[in-house]
Design a protein with these regions (language model features):
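Aromatic- and charge-enriched surface segment that lines or borders ligand/interaction sites
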Residues: 80-125, 151
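Short, well-ordered beta-strand elements
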Residues: 26-35, 79, 89-91, 111-115, ...
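Sec/Tat signal peptide C-region and signal peptidase I cleavage site
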Residues: 18-22
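Bacterial N-terminal signal peptides
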Residues: 7-16
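Gly/Pro-rich hinge or "lid" segments in bacterial periplasmic/extracellular proteins
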Residues: 66-67, 168-228, 242
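Short helix-initiation/N-cap motifs at beta->coil->alpha
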Residues: 137, 199, 234-244
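N-terminal lobe/hinge region of extracytoplasmic solute-binding protein
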Residues: 32-85, 116, 197-203
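Surface-exposed binding/hinge segments that line
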Residues: 93, 131-183, 208
């Protein structure tokens, strides 16, 4: 899973460490990277390279790429899954005891409504979930969740392995839907709030974000795969590669 990444303190970021800033804590990793490509950090709409790295470190999916062998899918927020005999349905069992950065427990509703939110907002990465034949109109007939179970169906002649890869993608990230809805403004589905805050289960949570300047993360001590080594990560924008 992500244990290797946690041990290396967010080595998922393919970045270069910068000289330490004044008063930087010993357990903080300071990184210099060009982050002005970021348009949004809401996982429902994030589509750029840098925002994708951010999403990877703050959110989880039901299944995830193994940290050691990235061609292998491993359990994430789901501990296991069963494929029906006709290869048309996958039933996921959610991991017990997982909490969001807010402290709210992970529920099947969070999974289902996070995916629906992607389709409703219809940002650039929505087509990835749309590959499964999911639309705002078809979603309720294809995805359901109750208790610790999420059931997924799809249209098209896809192998279940393709479906699992879609569900391991960043737009399939699960958000704390209760918290997101509490911060909805003018029907934006919490989009503005998620551009300044995180609402995931990932190894790090967002402390602050100043576009094209700095993005600061802090470790999640309750992360289900183990507490990250580094207490904080500061990603400072540096435009020229030669100055990194």
């Amino acid at each position: 899973m992500r244990q290797l990444a946690l041990t290396l303190a967010a080595s998922i970021f393919t970045l270069v460490a910068a000289p330490a800033m004044a008063n930087t804590p010993d357990e903080a990793l300071v990184i210099a990277q060009n982050i002005d490509d970021i348009v949004t950090i809401d996982p429902a709409t994030a589509y750029e390279f840098s925002s994708g790295e951010y999403v990877t470190n703050t959110y989880d999916q039901l299944v995830q790429y193994d940290a050691v062998d990235t061609e292998v899918l491993a359990p994430g927020l789901a501990t296991d899954w069963q494929i029906d005999a006709e290869n048309r349905t996958i039933t996921f069992t959610l991991r017990n005891g997982v909490t969001f950065h807010s402290g709210n427990p992970l529920r099947a509703e969070d999974v289902v409504e996070s995916w629906r939110r992607v389709l409703v907002i219809d940002g650039r990465p929505a087509f990835i979930l749309g590959n499964l034949g999911w639309t705002v109109d078809t979603f309720d007939s294809m995805v359901s969740g109750e208790g610790n179970t999420v059931i997924v169906r799809w249209s098209g002649d896809f192998a279940p392995s393709f479906v699992l890869n879609v569900l391991a993608s960043r737009p399939a990230s699960v958000v704390d839907i209760e918290t997101v809805r509490a911060h909805e403004v003018d029907g934006d589905h919490g989009h503005a709030w998620l551009n300044q805050n995180s609402a995931g289960t990932g190894p790090f949570s967002l402390i602050s974000y100043r576009p094209a300047e700095v993005l600061t993360l802090q470790r999640n001590p309750d992360y289900f795969a183990g507490t990250p080594t580094m207490e904080k990560i500061l990603i400072s924008h540096v435009a020229e590669a030669s100055t990194q």
